C-alpha cells in the first residue's frame, strides 16, 4: 500500500491539480468507488471515472467531456461510456458512430450528479423495486434464468462486492440509457487473472483497438439501439447456457481431453 501511494504521488504531471485521498482502512472496491464518485459529482456536477486497469486513448477525455456537455440537460441519459464491447463489432459497418444501450459500461465513463444522486447501493432494495414494478423480465432481457437478478441477489447476500450492478439497476429503474461509440476510447487491461473480479481472458482484446484519432460526437435521438439490445440478449443467453448446461460442461471436458491427448501424441512423436 505504501509503495502504491508513493508511486501515485510521484506521477502527477499533466494535471492542473491533484487531490489524493488516503484511507485509514481498506474500504473495499464498492464503497470506495461510490464514495469517490459521490464526492466529486456532487461538488462539480459531473464526474469522469477511470480505474487503475483502464488504458485510454489520447482522445478519451475529449470524447467523455463532449458527451457530458452534449447531454447535460437530458435526464434520460445515464452515462457516457468510452469502452466498446467486442460483441457489438459483429454489426461491422452497420454499427453507428454513436448509439444508446440499456447498460452502463464502467471501464472508462462519465456521468452527472443529476444521475448519480439516484444511485442506490442496496442491491436487495433495488431488486425489490424492480419486482414491485413488474419489470424483472425486462431487467433480465427476457433470459429465463434471470442472471441480472442473480447478480443483485449475490451482492445483497454479501457473496460479491460490486457497485456497477447497482448502477445498471438504478439507471434501469429511472428509465435511463447510456451513450457509447463505435470507436474505442478505453480498454481494460486487467483481465489477466491478477484482479479480483475477472479471470484471465483475451475476449476483451478481440477486434477492438483504441482509437488513434477523434471522431467528433454529434447529438442523436435518445432511444435504444434495438440491434445492440438483441446482441446483448443473445450473448447473455449464451453465457447463461454455458454456465448452467450439463451438456456444455460435458462437451468442454471431451474437448479438453481430446486436445490434451493430441498434444501428448505430438510431443511423443517428436521425442
Predicted stretch roles:
Residues 1-49, 54-271:
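An acidic/histidine-cluster motif and surrounding catalytic segment
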Amino acid at each position: 500500500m505504501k509503495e502504491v501511494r508513493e508511486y501515485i504521488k510521484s506521477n502527477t504531471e499533466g494535471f492542473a491539480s491533484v487531490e489524493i485521498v488516503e484511507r485509514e482502512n481498506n474500504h473495499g472496491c464498492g464503497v470506495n468507488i461510490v464514495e469517490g464518485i459521490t464526492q466529486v459529482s456532487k461538488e462539480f456536477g459531473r464526474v469522469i471515472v477511470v480505474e487503475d486497469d483502464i488504458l485510454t486513448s489520447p482522445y478519451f477525455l475529449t470524447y467523455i467531456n463532449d458527451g457530458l456537455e452534449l447531454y447535460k440537460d437530458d435526464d434520460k441519459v445515464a452515462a457516457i461510456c468510452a469502452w466498446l464491447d467486442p460483441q457489438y463489432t459483429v454489426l461491422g459497418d452497420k454499427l453507428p458512430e454513436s448509439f444508446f444501450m440499456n447498460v452502463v459500461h464502467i471501464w472508462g465513463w462519465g456521468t452527472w450528479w443529476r444521475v448519480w444522486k439516484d444511485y442506490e447501493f442496496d442491491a436487495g432494495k433495488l431488486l425489490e423495486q424492480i419486482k414491485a414494478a413488474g419489470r424483472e423480465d425486462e431487467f433480465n432481457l427476457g433470459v429465463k434464468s434471470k442472471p441480472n437478478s442473480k447478480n443483485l441477489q449475490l451482492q445483497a447476500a454479501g457473496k460479491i462486492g460490486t457497485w456497477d450492478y447497482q448502477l445498471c439497476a438504478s439507471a434501469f429503474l429511472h428509465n435511463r440509457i447510456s451513450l457509447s461509440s463505435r470507436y474505442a476510447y478505453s480498454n481494460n487491461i486487467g483481465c489477466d487473472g491478477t484482479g479480483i473480479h475477472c479471470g484471465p481472458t483475451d475476449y476483451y482484446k478481440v477486434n477492438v483497438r483504441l482509437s488513434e484519432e477523434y471522431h467528433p460526437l454529434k447529438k442523436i435521438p435518445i432511444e435504444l439501439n434495438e440491434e445492440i439490445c438483441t446482441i446483448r440478449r443473445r450473448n447473455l443467453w449464451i453465457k447463461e447456457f454455458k454456465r448452467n448446461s450439463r451438456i456444455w460442461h460435458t462437451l468442454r471436458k471431451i474437448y479438453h481431453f481430446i486436445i490434451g491427448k493430441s498434444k501428448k501424441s505430438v510431443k511423443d512423436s517428436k521425442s
